[in-house]
Design a protein with these regions (language model features):
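Alpha-helical transmembrane segments and immediately membrane-proximal extracytoplasmic
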Residues: 1-190
Length: 190
């Protein structure tokens, strides 16, 4: 598991930590770290030789300023709250669709329609989402403008995590196929 994450996201240390914590609800398996590190490193190197070692989101070229550390602590706290919101929203929508007494063929249609409406207003919500994260990283927020909304790019960027949470919850919680891991990465990145 750690090797796959480290290869796909080109983050061997992240894959190691992911493998050590993902199987446990409130724990961290220390005995798994060394084997996961070896698997993650080997997976990363093999994938790197095939696909290249360039990071997905580029390199950070700025300077380190210790005065910014409290801002990163606040960002971590906000991301933690967003993770809780993501889980609560997803399960609330999923449970609501389970309780809904209509055909199981209708539920994904309704979820897909709701996701489509959100995507119509903000197309950046659909898909993997890494494209607009890259644009934000390189300070090119003007490059994504919704054809319908005329909101400033910064407002769109601030609302995207919430809209991504709602769209993911409707599309998968209604019975559609897909996963919650990759959207969670994008939500956390935004």
């Amino acid at each position: 598991m750690g090797a796959g994450i480290s290869s796909i996201f080109k983050a061997p240390i992240g894959g190691t930590i992911f493998a050590a914590e993902i199987l446990y609800k409130r724990d961290f398996e220390v005995e798994v770290i060394f084997p996961a590190l070896i698997a993650s490193a080997i997976g990363y190197v093999i994938f790197g030789f095939v696909a290249g070692f360039t990071p997905i989101f580029g390199y950070y070229n700025g300077t380190f300023n210790p005065m910014e550390l409290p801002l990163y602590a606040v960002l971590g706290f906000v991301d933690g709250l967003m993770a809780i919101l993501y889980v609560k929203t997803f399960y609330s929508v999923h449970d609501a669709f389970k309780r809904w007494r209509v055909s199981n063929y209708i539920k994904p249609v309704v979820g897909g329609a709701a996701t489509g409406l959100i995507g119509l207003l903000t197309p950046e919500v659909l898909g993997a989402g890494c494209g607009w994260l890259n644009l934000a990283e390189f300070n090119r927020l003007n490059a994504f403008m919704s054809p319908i909304t005329t909101l400033p790019p910064l407002i769109i960027l601030a609302t995207l995590p919430f809209l991504k949470i709602i769209a993911t919850s409707f599309s998968i919680g209604s019975g559609g196929s897909g996963g919650v891991f990759a959207p969670g990465i994008v939500i956390g990145g935004s």
